[in-house]
Amino acid sequence: MFKLGKRSIERLQGVHPDLVKVVERAIDLSPVDFTVLEGLRSPERQQTLVASGASQTLNSRHITGHAVDLGAWVDNQVDWSWPLYHKIANAMKAAANELGVSIVWGGDWRTFKDGPHFELDRKFYP
């Protein structure tokens, strides 16, 4: 079983409490260790990410604390292997379902698939 590290906990500061609960439960369920790469994001940081092509919107859910990016943590570093993100997503979805929280995974998007990205569903968290 894995647990969130100090840095991950710090990066969850400012994130909506329901999403924090999902992440905290998912780390218990996940067969893959993960780290929180980013939670709450400033509008300036978002502009930088859009300019670099790392994001496609200035209206990111990160700006309101309604999104997190998680990185698969393997051999003390982030591993970007896509299959790992499916496993993390399964844990996040199971945790969300268990807690009655509706989330959206960036890996399920039709365009600009974003494996590390999880956000609270706008239908329930406008």
Please report, for each region that a protein language model flagged, where it lies by residue:
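Active-site acidic/histidine clusters and adjacent loop/turn architecture
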Residues: 1-33
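Charged, low-complexity, helix-prone segments enriched in Lys/Glu/Asp/Gln
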Residues: 12-15, 43-50, 85
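Catalytic cores and adjacent binding grooves of peptidoglycan-active enzymes
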Residues: 13, 56-126
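A broadly tuned "polar low-complexity/structure-edge" signature
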Residues: 17-20, 33-37, 89, 115-118
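Short glycine-/small-residue-rich flexible loop motifs, especially phosphate/cofactor-binding loops
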Residues: 23-24, 46, 89, 93
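Extended, low-complexity, intrinsically disordered C-terminal regulatory tails
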Residues: 25-52, 98, 104-106
